[in-house]
Swiss-Prot record:
Name of the gene: Rnaseh1
Main subcellular location of this protein, as a coarse class: cytoplasm
Protein name according to UniProt: Ribonuclease H1
Protein family according to the UniProt entry: Belongs to the RNase H family.
Transmembrane segments: none
Amino acid sequence: MRWLLPLFRTVTLAVVRVRRGVCGLGMFYAVRRGRRTGVFLSWSECKAQVDRFPAARFKKFATEDEAWAFVRSSSSPDGSKGQESAHVQKLQVKTSKRPREPLGEEEEPPEPGAKHTRQDTEPAALVSKDAFSYMGESVVVYTDGCCSSNGRKRARAGIGVYWGPGHPLNVGIRLPGRQTNQRAEIHAACKAITQAKAQNISKLVLYTDSMFTINGITNWVQGWKKNGWRTSTGKDVINKEDFMELDELTQGMDIQWMHIPGHSGFVGNEEADRLAREGAKQSEG
């Protein structure tokens, strides 16, 4: 978990937990002294570490930053401000070097004559569970997408998925089909979930710097489906096939979507970005 520590500096973070049919409250259970120390996503996970453990120290927090501060410190920071029922928890964004990403429904214009190409899925050998990094019982993964000359004829897009240092599932590949940044972000998440399913992983903490992807899958997609895959203004959803694929992949998964600022020095995000850029250099298969 050492390589995850830079994450726990004061950063902008939006946390969304989605499980089909269940909306999580996003509370964080910090264990400073117990069978295992760290931050857990449910009381049952926390209880297993502290129940009947001598002089156990643990506390519930509304934010991940506070929880990790409690784990690392010798004295407790201010505790939880109480449960929040909001679907998405947001802390104020301070800086991000990436240009502003459209946050409205489908702001990206379609590329004329472009076709959607579904990614092929390939069988994968099972990887030891010890090779993954965990937050509670959930496996941690970082995804990123990139596109040079976005929206132009010579655009080149790639996707990156980063599971940890030297991990065999780390991948950077060229995005098939229409070459845009938003499609790359969506399909990076698709790739990570596909890999997770192949490893029999059902609980994920998925870090992405794309609020467009997070909003799309946790917010907009349900409304689009009810509206015949049209936006609230009656327009066709530009990335319909991409979100349909992502929506299908999330079925049966317990995914906590976490937003992290892009290009701000966080190792997991920087590595996913590097893999995406390497993927964009590949020829389109």
